[in-house]
């Protein structure tokens, strides 16, 4: 059986705040809209996300994409 991989909203928010970035700053640096970042952070498990979005956010936060995901 395959594991379900999801973008973890809690991890995203925790890393963003630890890096001292606002949602707006992360949006500017990643080219991901503020509303998308807000939606991702307010949902604990985001099973429907675009891999390029994950990559953009990880680069802007200077972390590996795997740091932003969870799985079951």
Sequence positions of predicted segments:
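Short, basic-rich loop-to-helix N-cap that marks the start of a DNA-contacting helix
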Residues: 44-59
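Short C-terminal boundary/hinge segments that cap the last helix of small helical domains
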Residues: 62-72
């Amino acid at each position: 059986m395959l594991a379900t991989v999801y973008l973890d909203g809690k991890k995203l928010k925790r890393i963003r705040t630890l890096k001292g970035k606002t949602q707006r700053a992360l949006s500017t640096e990643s080219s991901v809209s503020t509303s998308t970042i807000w939606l991702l952070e307010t949902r604990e498990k985001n099973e429907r996300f675009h891999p390029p979005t994950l990559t953009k956010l990880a680069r802007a936060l200077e972390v590996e994409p795997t740091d932003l995901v969870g799985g079951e």
